[in-house]
UniProtKB/Swiss-Prot annotation:
Residues 1-16 form the signal peptide. Plays a role in the inhibition of host NF-kappa-B and IRF3 signaling pathways. Mechanistically, promotes the degradation of host IKBKG through enhancing its ubiquitination leading to inhibition of both pathways. Keywords: Glycoprotein, Host-virus interaction, Inhibition of host NF-kappa-B by virus, Signal. The keyword Lipid metabolism does not apply. Induction: Expressed in the intermediate phase of the viral replicative cycle (immediately after DNA replication). One of its GO terms (biological process) is symbiont-mediated suppression of host NF-kappaB cascade. Glycans are attached at residues 142, 164. This is Late protein I226R. Belongs to the asfivirus I226R family. It comes from African swine fever virus (strain Badajoz 1971 Vero-adapted) (Ba71V). It comes from the Viruses.
């Protein structure tokens, strides 16, 4: 089943979903505590044999509208390799749902936050790198500003405990992965805006860039009030 077909089916005809996806929806609705081994085993059985199903598992979150289910989902994932994969899934989640105007930011951000809390400082850098350099974002210049702003806002949650941007950029610079999206995220950090209003070094000499900074800051403030 094509992803676009699946999404239409998911949002308009949940009864027509594949049997395995129905099982996942059922398990997520059971409201069983994360200590329940049976539920963990069942989720593992459905998730790990097929990575496409791992991706699908994130999709129903906007339908369930239940914080407990979403928190449980991110708690189930323990190993770091899977967490890195989860970063890609979260990115795809934003992009695909945006296409159907079904994006609900709080639910996406909670998943990002819960995953990032499991990682130490170095692992958060890696998680961030996966999030912003995902294959899905290789053509980031063609993405709408709404999607980019949502991703940037999510990235702030990953580093909320210690948002040391100079260190993050230094790490990424070593790997030649400085992207436009990273630049936007750095200049649009709320604390930095309050202290400096805008990064003079980057913006004052370039009218076009300065205007883009202002637009990004405004958009992020709007997103922050959602």
């Amino acid at each position: 089943m094509k992803m676009e077909t699946f999404l239409v089916c998911l949002f308009h005809n949940a009864d027509g979903l594949h049997q395995q996806i129905q099982e996942i929806l059922y398990l997520l609705r059971m409201h069983i505590y994360e200590t329940n081994l049976y539920l963990k085993q069942e989720l593992s059985r459905l998730i790990y044999p097929n990575r496409q199903l791992s991706f699908v598992l994130l999709m129903p979150l906007s339908l369930l509208r239940n914080w407990d289910d979403i928190e449980y989902l991110t708690d189930v994932v323990d190993d770091k390799q899977t967490l890195h994969y989860a970063a890609n899934l979260l990115t795809n989640y934003v992009l695909h749902l945006s296409m159907f105007q079904k994006l609900t930011k709080p639910y996406f951000l909670l998943a990002v936050k819960r995953v990032s809390e499991k990682l130490n400082k170095r692992q958060r850098h890696s998680f961030y790198e996966v999030l912003v350099t995902s294959e899905t974002l290789n053509n980031y210049e063609n993405l709408s500003k709404n999607i980019l702003n949502t991703l940037m806002f999510a990235v702030r949650y990953v580093f909320k405990p210690t948002p040391n941007y100079s260190e993050i950029l230094a790490e990424l610079e070593k790997k030649n992965k400085i992207h436009h999206i990273i630049f936007n995220m750095v200049i649009a950090d709320f604390a930095q805006i309050r202290k400096q209003q805008m990064d003079k070094h980057l913006c004052e000499t370039n009218n076009e860039l300065r205007q883009e900074c202002k637009e990004t800051i405004f958009d992020l403030k709007v997103v922050g009030n959602v």
